[in-house]
Amino acid sequence: IMLEQLFNLVKEASGDAVINNPAVPNEHNNEVVAEATNTVASGLRNMVAGGGLQSIISLFSNKNEQGSGSNSLLNNPIVNMMIGHFSGKLTNKYNIDGTQANNVASNLIPNVLSNLINKTNDPSDNGFSLEGLLNSITGGKTAEVVQEQQNSGNSGFNFQDLIGKFTGGGQQNGGGGNGLMDIVSRLAGGAQAQQQKNGGGGLMDLIKGF
């Protein structure tokens, strides 16, 4: 997914939390939405860069009854990390009171992620896919890994099989050199390169795209 789509998703979710919230000064609405977008994007990217691909996959493939509901997301450490980061930004950058900032973050971030997970899992929504998201986070490394699998004689191998390796579905066996750790570290490398490209990940980076 490109950042623009994520930005629009955040914007859609930000009505009550940001736009109609008197605690967030109106002149900062767009910047706050951009900041939230950046928090989610860089949070996911940092997870992959730190070798946490498995955590992202389980976050996105958790389709049990309330697995991706915004309430159960509050129990997820990745989500809590994002909430803390975003809340800190609101307080430090926009002088929003700590309690209010925490309320905004705890409302907006799980909502956005919940929508993102639902859209990513919705086959009729072509704009969002876990494949597109990971490819964007890793600067194209995900597609590269899948392509290599196909080239090494595993011609039917696709992105679902890659995910299957982590969730226990899909083709477990396939040509050599495709150990899970190898894949995790390749994608981590791609995400690290993207992190560096984006420097501190400020608002301008966000507007320029991943």
Locate each region found by the language model:
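A structural "flexibility-hinge" signal
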Residues: 2-210
